[in-house]
Design a protein with these regions (language model features):
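Active-site/acyl-donor-binding loops of N-acyltransferases
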Residues: 2-9, 66-67, 124, 128-157, ...
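A conserved beta-strand-loop-helix scaffold within acyl/acetyltransferase catalytic domains
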Residues: 2-73, 116-145, 149-261
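Short glycine-enriched loop/turn motifs at secondary-structure junctions
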Residues: 21-22, 78-81, 280
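A general structural signal for short secondary-structure junctions and capping/turn motifs
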Residues: 42-44, 102-105, 136-139, 276-277, ...
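Short, high-confidence coil segments that cap the C-terminus of an alpha-helix
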Residues: 47-49, 106-110, 224, 279-282
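A gly/proline- and charged-residue-enriched helix-loop-helix capping module
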Residues: 78-119
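Short catalytic-loop micro-motif centered on adjacent basic/acidic residues
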Residues: 111-114, 180, 284-286
Length: 337
């Protein structure tokens, strides 16, 4: 028999004999799928969690929500590379997701899940489960994800395939920049990163406390790769990566605008790419979301991220939204001729 529950108590979930291990680093190979990530979002970013859980025997399906003004939405923010449901590997797990969709219809008429991947089938799985349960699903591209699949290449082989201007920059500027790659958290280096970030082209940091807590935890677990670049003894560029499950994740990077002429960001990136490829032996690198032009110099694949708007079509509150959506679609068709 399928049991369905909703909880805001993440400590209770952590102590659960089935869910605690399922949502731990032992079972999940990316930080965004773990309970610790959601706990940090709650503690530092003000996102109140609501976990929707369906379970039967040793199988479970978990949809991590936070409540927005229009209903549940993905428990995620700008630090999250992608959002997806977490399921056990048993054959009953997809049916549990459908059971959740049916139960959610009792109390909600609209759910928005942004940042969903589909290279792993996640968006399609959620769409199918909710449609079977009587929901309408509207899928739209909302972001892009730049990635690199190494396919056995070492760093030098990878570098030889980079654009000529980038390789020229690295050849000319590498001798002018001193770089270090740390595999542990260092408070002094982190302070330098925060100082560099404040003088960079980047917008104001959304939650410095979240980022530092994450870096400290990843450092303690041995997954942190913290890069720092100096010119003339002054720290001028810094980057934060993590490595796990055969993938390196590029979380943050910044350089001082005053040092732009010596390309410290590119030189530091090269050092980190070399480290994760030749030392950590990763099979892939994930540059997160956003279509920044510089990502194309380093990455080779672009994957879409989707927003799923899940709607109960019979709910009157959804009719204006559905009418506007239909008009937008008609306008697109008319524009195509």
């Amino acid at each position: 028999m399928i049991a369905i529950a909703y909880t805001r108590d993440l400590k209770e979930v952590q102590s659960d004999a089935l869910l605690g291990p399922l949502l731990s680093a032992d079972r999940q190979g990316a930080p965004f799928d773990r309970l610790a990530w959601w706990q940090a979002l709650e503690q530092h970013c003000g996102l109140t969690p609501l976990l929707a859980i369906a379970r039967e025997g040793d199988d479970a399906a978990v949809l991590p929500f936070t409540l927005g003004k229009d209903g549940p939405r993905a428990l995620a923010n700008w630090y999250t590379f992608r959002f997806r449901p977490i399921l056990t590997n048993g054959p009953a797990a997809p049916a549990l997701l459908t059971a959740l969709a049916r139960d959610l219809a009792r109390t909600h008429s609209r759910i928005v899940l942004s940042g969903m991947p589909d290279e792993d089938g996640s968006a399609t799985l959620v769409e199918r489960a909710f449609r079977v349960a009587g929901w309408l699903s509207i899928r739209e591209e909302c972001d892009t994800n730049h990635v690199l699949t190494l396919q056995g290449r070492d760093y030098q082989t990878y570098l030889s395939g980079r654009p000529g201007p980038l390789r020229t920059t690295l050849k000319r500027k590498s001798g002018k920049v001193d770089v270090r790659v740390l595999t542990h958290f260092d408070p002094a280096i982190w302070a330098a990163y925060e100082d560099i970030y404040a003088e960079s082209w980047k917008p104001e940091e959304g939650s410095p406390a979240f980022l530092r807590a994450f870096a400290e935890a990843e450092g303690a677990a041995g997954r942190l790769r913290l890069g720092i670049a100096h010119v003339g003894g002054e720290p001028v560029a810094a980057q934060m990566w993590t490595v796990e499950g055969g993938t390196a994740f590029i979380h943050k990077l910044a350089h001082r605008e005053s040092a732009k002429s010596v390309s410290p960001g590119s030189v530091l990136s090269a050092a980190l790419f070399r480290h994760v490829i030749d030392v950590d032996l990763v099979s892939g690198i994930d540059f997160g979301t956003g279509d920044n032009p510089y990502k194309r110099d380093w990455m080779e694949l672009v994957r879409p991220r989707y927003s799923l708007t899940l709607i109960r079509p019979a709910a009157p509150r959804n009719w204006p939204f559905l009418a506007k959506f239909a008009l937008r679609r008609l306008a697109r068709w008319a524009k195509r001729g």
